[in-house]
Amino acid sequence: MSKLKIDGKEITARRGETVLEVCQREGIYIPTLCYQKNLTPYGGCRLCIVEVKGWSMPAASCTLPVEDGMVIKTNTPKLKKLRKFSLQLILSEHPHSCLICEKEEECAQYQECIQKSAITFGCKFCSQNNNCELQKLVSYFGVREIPFIFNYRHLGIERFDPFFDRDYNICILCGRCVRVCGEIRGAHVLDFHHRGPDTLVGTSFDLPHLETGCQFCGACVDVCPTGALHQRYGKWEGEVQKSVTSTCILCSIGCSIKLNVCNNKVVSSTPNNNQICVRGRFGIAPLIHHPKRITAPMIKRNGRMVQVSWEEALNCAVSKFNEHRGKIGILFSNQLTTEAIDSTYNFANNLKCNNITASLEMKNNFKPYDCKKIKGDSVFIFINTNMIENYSPLFLKLKSKRNVNLVVIDSLKNRFSEVADFWLRPKPGKEIDVLKLLFARKKMSNTTGVSYNTIKLTTRLLSGKKTYLFCNPNNIDNIHVPKRVRLIPLYSQINALKILNAGVGCSLADLLNNNKIDCLYLIGSAPKLSRDYKTIIVQDNFPPLFEFDVFLPTATFTETKGTYINIEGKKKILQKAIDPPGKSKPDDWIIAEMSKILKFGMNPSKQKYRKIVRRGALKKRSLTRKYPHFLIVRENCYSYRGLILSLVMKGFKRLKYDNYIWIAPDVAKKLNIKNGMELKIQGQNIDITMPAYISDTVPENCVFAYSHLSMGINTSQPVRLERAEEGRKKE
């Protein structure tokens, strides 16, 4: 502990603290611009300078460690003058006409008609107006003139990447984006280019972010103090009127987020003192306000879907249920609230319907694990799981543990395999055999495609260290590990553990292949249907690809209250941020209203459904002359209520390519396949057509696809490829 005096106040500071940190803790205000909590101090803006007794020059408090006996002054006339001078220097390369204008308040009424200008000349042209740290500092220092010639950089605005724009004409070179990208996210996409007055922030060789490994997490946007980096969606919606703390449900982690609202519209979603991923940062607002969303009840009348009142729609649905009693199938999404899931189970029980299951078919049942209990000095093994793409917030927490090693077992090459200490690339379907070799007590034959030397080196790494094995249970079958290895399941969707504990009446395949079912009730799910049904009732936000008889529009997770169970078995709270648009209603409200009409009680269901148990290994299918290529299928974690995000948002389409069949270069060369060509993929239980995307991430003689419930893609298997009659170039 150190004792020092700041502005005449005796203060005790902890060892390693900086003067700025001590002042912030004690409530002593020091202006900053380049400083950001949890990032390495930069000392670039010089606004946080302080005077230290005995020192000839002021020092930047953000980089100044405390020392015993220090006497510091933070607010002298000399410091005020120097800070104001530094701010004026910064403003000499930043459009400042509005910042120093005496009539700035008078022109506020004209802001809306000029703010969408292509070039930002002043605050009224900037999307960050009234939310800019520079504006606050100019007001604090009372800056009314800039004694330097204005230097405008004349840089083009970068709009060629998805999700956010970059206008480096208003960048102040604070370095926050560079540091957060490297230090917190570990992506190292951004850095400073050139020197002196030519210094700029950018990517290596000025490549687009899509080509540099950018995670599009938005961390750089969140720390930017000006409008240099700004989210594209909602950019001109206006100032945020309220921020509601809630939970992101677009994956199983359940990150805490802030839903920022303006005029009953979510304009953005931002982290709540944590890190989130591209789905939570840029996927929520455009998804829930998408123009294709249906917000009014509809029924089929004379072969056409027409809008009706809730009373008519509910009565129509109830009449269908009564008509098909005993022949009803219910398929619901894991992404319903736990309250809506309970209501669904109770509704099925009252209907005496045992044909009920969840859209995410969980093939293995493992116990949850609190990731806070994971210790350092360990080895983390990840099998068939891309943590950077699918679980980046969790991966950042794991990576922060002290002295850990990463081992990736995956036949696919990706960003995550490239950052691992060891990447074991087996033949597709041989991942379990690699695990057996790693933990074998005696020598075994090796047919995995991974060299004995790599196995040996990895085994040495595991020796004497605590080992954790992470896997998505739906990407691997029949997994067994020694007792000393802790297996941690990474289910892709929230509430997976809720479904596992509650059980289901049947499997997804049994439900869809049951010819006795005449009425299908789909709650947030739209699978590929292999046959016709007499009645299909859809309860969702978006219409399915097939015809239906009744549509009941539901509220999204931003428009209702509730709870969810995350990947660790913890309850996550959902808060209502906005009112549902149109006539949309929460799922549990819809089910409750139909139960009233049917005179059902709403007491908890006593029906006991079968627990989901581990399934045995799939029968291995060898390549044949008829099916010469192996299709690798991995679960698509970028979906909401069965809807693939790339189908409704262009940014995700450019980022994921999950509506393409990925082709290994050797297969493309052999079959003369070009990017964008329509290919027919046929196997024992698959027959689809998709455009081609050639990628070296796919191993030889293989193709790869993300799982698609709506297309029936869910199992890795041997396939054959045929070029469709018409081809089109990849967008």
Regions found by a protein language model. Give the residues of each.
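N-terminal export/assembly segments and adjacent metallocofactor-ligating motifs
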Residues: 1-17, 21-24, 36, 51-54, ...
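A cross-kingdom feature strongest in bacterial/archaeal respiratory oxidoreductases
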Residues: 30, 35-36, 345, 369, ...
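Short, glycine-/polar-rich solvent-exposed loops and beta-turns at beta-strand/coil boundaries
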Residues: 35-42, 64-65, 195, 675, ...
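Short acidic beta-strand-loop surface patches of small beta-rich interaction domains
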Residues: 40-44, 50-55
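Short acidic (Asp/Glu) and glycine-rich catalytic loops that position anionic groups and cofactors
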Residues: 63-68, 197-200, 296, 414-420, ...
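A generic structural motif
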Residues: 104, 353-363, 406-412, 483-498, ...
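Phosphate/pyrophosphate-binding active-site segments
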Residues: 432-470
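A glycine-rich, hydrophobic/aromatic-adjacent loop/helix-cap motif
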Residues: 462-513
